[in-house]
Amino acid sequence: MSSVNSRGSVTALRFGRLLLTGAAGGLGRELRTRLKGYCEKLRLSDIDDLGKAADGEELHVVALEDRAAMRSLLEGVDAVVHMGGVSVEGPFDPILQANIVGVYNLYEAARLAGVRRIVLASSNHVTGFYRQDQVVSPADPVRPDSYYGVSKAFGENLARFYFDRYGIETACLRIGSSFPEPRDRRMLATWLSYDDLERLVVACLSAPVVGFAVVYGLSDNRVRWWDNTGAMHLGFVPQDSSEPFRAALEAKQPSLDLDDPQVVFQGGAYVRMGPFE
């Protein structure tokens, strides 16, 4: 029987070698400490400095767009948690290289290495041009709000192809806003606590069957824009909520301009970013 740790995550899960890409990024740094207990070896990659390797860690400085290096990186890996790539909106070319070329390199390397499961960081910005008064499910058409959102929609479609063609299972996580606590009014609906992030990733790694799945990464917030019932088959049960932060956040937020696209659409500020050339 599986045991559960103090954060509500399954602890019986154990891989030989687990790869975490983007390990120097914000969520990567958080998951680096949390995933150690789920594998014999935790292989970490990023283009930025990863510091010193702790016991059981393997450090690799690798650019996602370097196809040969990615193939070497995936050798001997049992499963992948992909947090790498450009994580914000910006000019198209860097997003193209990291989030489109890079995710292709990841999946092709996984195919060659015989990897059977990937947890892929997608984004809520895949559906950012839905209104905040709408409830969206993964079954609804994508409506990306940015080049970044477009790149994440590509990643989901590529993952679908690699499952249908090669049987590589993927859980695509449309992550909301994962921080220690929500920072603004929008995040009251989109917040994903670090503990719930761990619960979600571990659920996706440990579920007996994933197939191809798209789920939203959010905590048990009172106000929600996303129908996440599809995550139930993965065993993800969020335990945190943004509600305890509501009063303090709303007290310091400016009055809402109901005509502001950042207030109208779920993508917030992303719907107004750019053009960049």
Regions found by a protein language model. Name each.
Residues Q97, R131-T170:
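Catalytic helix-loop patch of NAD(P)-dependent Rossmann-fold dehydrogenases
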Residues R174-E181, W191-F212, D220:
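Alpha-helical substrate-binding/gating segment
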Residues E65, P94-N105, A113, N124, ...:
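Glycine-rich NAD(P)-binding loop of the Rossmann-fold in SDR/ketoreductase-type enzymes
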Residues F15-G37:
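N-terminal Rossmann NAD(P)H-binding glycine-rich loop of SDR-like oxidoreductase domains
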Residues G51, E57, V62-A98:
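NAD(P)H-binding glycine-rich loop region in Rossmannoid oxidoreductase-like domains
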Residues N105-R143:
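Conserved Rossmann-fold NAD(P)-dependent oxidoreductase catalytic core, especially the SDR/UDP-sugar
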Residues D220-V237, K252-F276:
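Conserved C-terminal active-site "lid" loop/helix of NAD(P)H-dependent oxidoreductases
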